[in-house]
């Protein structure tokens, strides 16, 4: 009898232990859910606090906008002058200046763009290419093939984007300075490494040889074509695929929910539609529903064409030097156009908005005609008052 009861007792005890384990799992899941809820609340509170602080800082910056612009202009001019001096005095240090610039200003730009809902701009090709530049300069500075790929990016799509998209060198705007330097600095870096770096000179003029070598060493035309044209295009199409998957597939619903979030396509199509220019007409060749596809095709054609132009630039020092002057001149010219044509209109619009936001009674006070304060008018008023008192 006892033998028969043992399995029953064991079964009951096992059942009790199973219930206990089940209860423990429920308790743990409740605790996890509570912890998640607490963390989400804390995250939302932190986000609200940060957004309030950001709005407060933005308002304070707007109040002192004139002073901030003057300080930015001063520092921008001094920094650009110092960079030009360093470019002539110690060209071998220019890559380190570029790396320092990238590690300081790109994270700051992400914070600023995140607040403005522009952070998807940091998925653009220029940031992808700049990341590859950092890998080359910091990890593989003597890799000739990677250098040629980076050279093709820097003096191809990035350099011509500076000209075609009219990036403006405006020293009073940190955002515009950073936009220009992201496209301009890489080309200057690889120009100095290619032609002005003392280490490159040693490789080009090795001791004990009468002939002139080159760095990077180009074996034949097929080698040049492969590493200056084909491989960069493969890397570009890889970026295009990743960009499409992230923006148009993975984050599609997020972008549809919030039309204020900007991407490069949204920004360019918005400007092109407003101006009704050639880009807007070209992007509509396949219909409005296929504008995104046309934008990708046009960008691919632009990349292929500008990448092909890097081959003669790579082979000629004179042509490469002239191209540097062309890029800087275009950025300065666009900056002058912005200061003389665009900025005055922006100032007028800001003043108009400020006047519209003023209280109605202040506007009424300013709109009322002022009374004549001349001595004759004052005398007439005094006589009128006295005569009224006598009556």
Swiss-Prot record:
Q: Give the primary localization class.
A: membrane
- Residue ranges annotated as Lumenal topological domain: 88-92, 141-144, 194-226, 316-318
Q: What is its EC number?
A: 2.3.1.-
> What is the protein's name according to its record?
Glycerophosphocholine acyltransferase 1
Instruction: Give the protein's function.
Output: Glycerophosphocholine acyltransferase (GPCAT) that utilizes acyl-CoA to acylate glycero-3-phosphocholine (GPC), forming lysophosphatidylcholine (LPC). Shows broad acyl specificities with a preference for 16:0-CoA, polyunsaturated acyl-CoA, and the hydroxylated ricinoleoyl-CoA. Also catalyzes the acylation of glycero-3-phosphoethanolamine (GPE) with acyl-CoA. In addition to acyl-CoA, GPCAT efficiently utilizes LPC and lysophosphatidylethanolamine (LPE) as acyl donors in the acylation of GPC.
For this UniProt entry, what's an example GO CC term?
membrane
Q: TM segments?
A: 67-87, 93-113, 120-140, 145-165, 173-193, 227-247, 295-315, 319-339
The Swiss-Prot or TrEMBL record describes its family as follows: Belongs to the GPC1 family.
Q: Which residues lie on this side of the membrane: Cytoplasmic?
A: 1-66, 114-119, 166-172, 248-294, 340-391
Q: Does the keyword Lipid metabolism apply?
A: yes
Q: What is the lineage of its organism?
A: Eukaryota, Viridiplantae, Streptophyta, Embryophyta, Tracheophyta
């Amino acid at each position: 009898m006892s033998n028969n009861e043992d399995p029953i007792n064991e079964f009951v005890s096992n059942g009790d232990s199973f219930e206990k384990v089940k209860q423990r799992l429920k308790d743990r899941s409740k605790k996890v859910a509570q912890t998640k809820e607490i963390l989400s609340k804390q995250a939302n509170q932190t986000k609200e606090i940060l957004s309030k602080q950001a709005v407060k800082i933005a308002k304070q910056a707007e109040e002192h906008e004139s002073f901030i612009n003057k300080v930015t202009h001063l520092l921008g001019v001094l920094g650009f002058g110092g960079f030009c001096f360093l470019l002539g005095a110690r060209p071998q240090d220019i890559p380190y200046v570029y790396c320092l610039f990238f590690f300081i200003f790109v994270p700051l730009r992400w914070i600023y763009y995140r607040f403005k809902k522009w952070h998807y701009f940091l998925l653009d090709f220029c940031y992808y290419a700049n990341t590859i530049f950092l890998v080359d300069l910091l990890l593989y500075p003597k890799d000739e093939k990677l250098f040629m790929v980076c050279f093709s990016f820097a003096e191809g799509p990035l350099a011509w984007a500076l000209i075609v998209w009219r990036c403006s060198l405006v020293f009073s705007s940190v955002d515009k300075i950073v936009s220009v330097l992201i496209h301009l600095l890489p080309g200057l870096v690889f120009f100095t490494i290619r032609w002005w770096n003392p280490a490159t000179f040693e490789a080009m003029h090795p001791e004990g040889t009468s002939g002139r070598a080159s760095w990077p060493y180009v074996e034949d035309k097929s080698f040049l074509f492969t590493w200056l044209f084909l491989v960069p295009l493969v890397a570009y199409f890889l970026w295009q695929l990743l960009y499409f998957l992230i923006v148009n597939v993975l984050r599609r619903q997020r972008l549809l929910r919030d039309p204020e979030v900007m991407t490069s396509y949204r920004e360019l199509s918005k400007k092109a539609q407003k101006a009704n220019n050639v880009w807007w007409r070209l992007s509509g060749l396949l219909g409005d529903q296929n504008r995104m596809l046309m934008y990708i095709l046009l960008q691919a054609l632009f990349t292929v064409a500008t990448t092909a132009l890097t081959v003669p630039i790579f082979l000629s020092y004179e042509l490469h030097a002239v191209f540097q002057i062309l890029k800087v001149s275009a950025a300065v010219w666009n900056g002058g156009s912005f200061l003389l044509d665009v900025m005055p209109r922006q100032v007028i619009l800001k003043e108009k908005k400020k006047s519209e936001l003023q209280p109605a009674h202040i506007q009424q006070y300013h709109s009322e005609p002022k009374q004549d304060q001349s001595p004759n008018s004052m005398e007439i008023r005094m006589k009128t008052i006295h005569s009224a008192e006598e009556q």
